[in-house]
């Protein structure tokens, strides 16, 4: 595939003998005029990202805001009497996260209604399709502030997605996501077909119980992505998606699922909780006496200073499980927003840069655990035409139901 950009919003694409030039619409601009805010908090300079102040309504994501969606310099703050407030004197503002707070001594107090005007740009995914006659055609997607999706294709084969967001001022290679194949891994990375599922080797007791139609208790243990209170339908949680597919794979088995999730926390937080806490490791995980623990901890990604520290903690957990006859499947974490991972692009990101993921993969090679490598799928999404940040409902690190399904995919791959 050859790409040329003869003008800011013009794309010429050549692919397998076909060529076409498309005019791509810039990101949709939304202008908000005199939006009422009954009260604003004081600015907190020590806050985290969007928590320094109050999030503008128009650019909100679930629990957070959409970074870089706001048009720089567009904010105007006025009182109901028409007085314009001054940034740095009356209020402070984070233009990346669209978060605003009042300053002490300014013209407004927390009970002063204010009118805010601003503009922001939405995200969109368009798709280039090869039609039955071999020609190329562009199908425009719908604009969305947080979760744009590719358009529905009525005919033809999608060959590339074009992604634009608030930071896109002109098209480049970064905006074009070729769809290499509708597969979960590259052909050159496909392992040889296994005669025995890896779960049978790594989780022998659990696997045999499933196969024999016995009762099996599975405990899903993790952070907010396991607790998943942000998902409207509990059936969309990764562990529920896994359960349904596991029941289909082993229809005679009697599977009980227990979920132990704690938003914003790590394995260390669980280990340090006192007796009687709803998140005490001993009482809620070990004493539940599951046959299998499946753990998911993206929050552990920044927890360990080196592999030795990781080995000490995960080795302790493994010993605790082994002493009680509990088997362990470990999920590698999904991708979060690029700047949290040390990535500079949502493309060419197959190799997960997080040391934690490397620690997990090495741990699974040398210890009797099952690794379900969801991170591998997330690193491959750009090859499927999917910018991975468009699957994060909070624009940071909470996957939508499709993103959660990749955990179930990674697990079932090892059971089939």
Protein language model regions, located:
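Serine-esterase "nucleophile elbow" of acetyl-processing enzymes
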Residues: 194-261, 280-289, 293
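Polybasic, proline/glycine-rich intrinsically disordered low-complexity segments
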Residues: 142-201
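Second-shell loop/turn segments in exported
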Residues: 225-233, 300-307, 346-350, 392-397
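Solvent-exposed loop/turn segments at secondary-structure junctions
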Residues: 224-227, 262-268, 298-304, 334-338, ...
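Extended beta-strand solenoid/passenger and fiber regions
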Residues: 1-99, 103-104, 121-134
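Extended acidic/polar, glycine-enriched regions
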Residues: 116-126, 131-133, 140, 144-149, ...
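Catalytic His-Asp segment of secreted/periplasmic serine-dependent ester chemistry enzymes
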Residues: 199, 334-416
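Internal alpha/beta domain cores that form substrate/cofactor-binding pockets in large enzymes
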Residues: 219, 251-288, 293-295, 300-333
């Amino acid at each position: 595939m050859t790409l040329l950009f003869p003008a800011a919003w013009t794309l010429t694409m050549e692919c397998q003998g076909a060529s076409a030039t498309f005019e791509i619409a810039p990101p949709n601009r939304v202008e908000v005029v005199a939006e009422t805010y009954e009260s604003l908090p004081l600015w907190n300079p020590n806050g985290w990202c969007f928590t320094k102040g109050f999030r503008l309504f128009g650019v909100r994501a679930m629990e957070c805001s959409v970074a870089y969606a706001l048009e720089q310099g567009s904010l105007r703050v006025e009182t109901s009497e028409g007085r314009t407030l001054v940034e740095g004197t009356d209020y402070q503002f984070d233009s990346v996260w669209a978060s605003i707070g009042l300053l002490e001594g300014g013209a407004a107090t927390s009970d002063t209604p204010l009118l805010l005007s601003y503009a922001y740009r939405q995200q969109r995914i368009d798709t280039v399709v090869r039609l039955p006659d071999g020609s190329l055609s562009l199908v425009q997607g719908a604009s969305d502030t947080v979760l744009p999706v590719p358009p529905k294709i009525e005919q033809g084969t999608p060959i590339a997605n074009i992604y634009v967001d608030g930071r896109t001022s002109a098209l480049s290679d970064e905006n074009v996501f070729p769809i290499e194949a509708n597969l979960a891994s590259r052909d050159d990375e496909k392992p040889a077909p296994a005669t025995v599922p890896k779960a049978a080797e790594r989780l022998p007791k659990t696997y045999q119980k499933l196969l024999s139609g016995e009762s099996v208790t599975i405990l899903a243990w993790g952070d907010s992505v396991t607790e998943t209170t942000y998902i409207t339908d509990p059936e969309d949680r990764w562990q529920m998606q896994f359960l349904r597919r596991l029941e289909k794979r082993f229809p005679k088995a009697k599977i009980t699922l227990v979920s132990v999730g704690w938003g914003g926390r790590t394995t260390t937080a669980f280990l340090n909780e006192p007796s009687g806490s709803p998140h005490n490791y001993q009482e809620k995980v070990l004493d539940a006496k599951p046959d299998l623990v499946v753990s998911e901890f993206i929050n552990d990604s920044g927890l360990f200073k080196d592999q030795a520290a990781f080995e000490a903690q995960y080795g302790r957990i493994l010993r605790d499980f082994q002493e009680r006859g509990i088997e362990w499947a470990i999920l590698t974490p999904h991708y979060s927003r690029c700047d949290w991972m040390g990535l500079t692009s949502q493309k060419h990101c197959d190799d997960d840069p997080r040391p934690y993921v490397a620690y997990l993969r090495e741990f699974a090679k040398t210890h009797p655990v099952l690794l379900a490598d969801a991170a591998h799928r997330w690193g491959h999404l750009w090859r499927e035409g999917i910018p991975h940040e468009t699957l994060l409902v909070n624009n940071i690190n909470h996957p939508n139901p499709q993103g959660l399904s990749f955990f179930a995919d990674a697990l079932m791959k090892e059971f089939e």
